[in-house]
Amino acid sequence: EEVAKSGIYIASDVPAPRIYPIGLHALDTGSSVFVQSAQTSGEVEIVIHVGDKIHVGVGSDHTDRALETVSIPGSKQACVNHLAPTFWAWDDIADTWDDCIMRSWVDDRLYQEVGVSKFLSPPDILSILKERVNNLPDKNYMVYCGTYVSVDKALGYGNKWRYQLETPKLKRQIDAQYDVVDILNEVKSGFRVPLFNPQG
């Protein structure tokens, strides 16, 4: 609903959860995310890492919202997906998983807060991937698992993003943050190539 209000088309004819492949170049754990638009925003998501064992963590799917009105898959490649470098072993967290909470903040304002019980569990996500992805490897891949509406039900923009995964029962949390750097501002006004080609 919040993205639809911004003119972003959701492929409702494709069964949810919808899958958007991204390359490894679109993952980053650094302190800055570089963009070319003032209309970009993050959104907190559970991240699954499938290796010899399953681990869970948290990341921010930072997205160019202007480009997203034209192509959702393209917008996913235009900005990196930020990743917190800490993961928990699924076996250690599975029994208390439904009590975990995700949060994000933009410019120190609470942007999202949601319990992970609102989402499919990591095992359910991986089961769906096996049904819908061609040649899914047995291991060595990651999955960002989708997000939830912001607290004010509107897309937020800002310069500083922070996100968190907390397990209250185990008193553990994963935190990460990054600054947004609009590199288009390096080019003087009047010399910037438009984000979209002129129509007509």
Predicted feature descriptions by range:
Residues 1-138, 142, 149-200:
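Catalytic-core "active-site belt" of small-molecule-metabolizing enzymes
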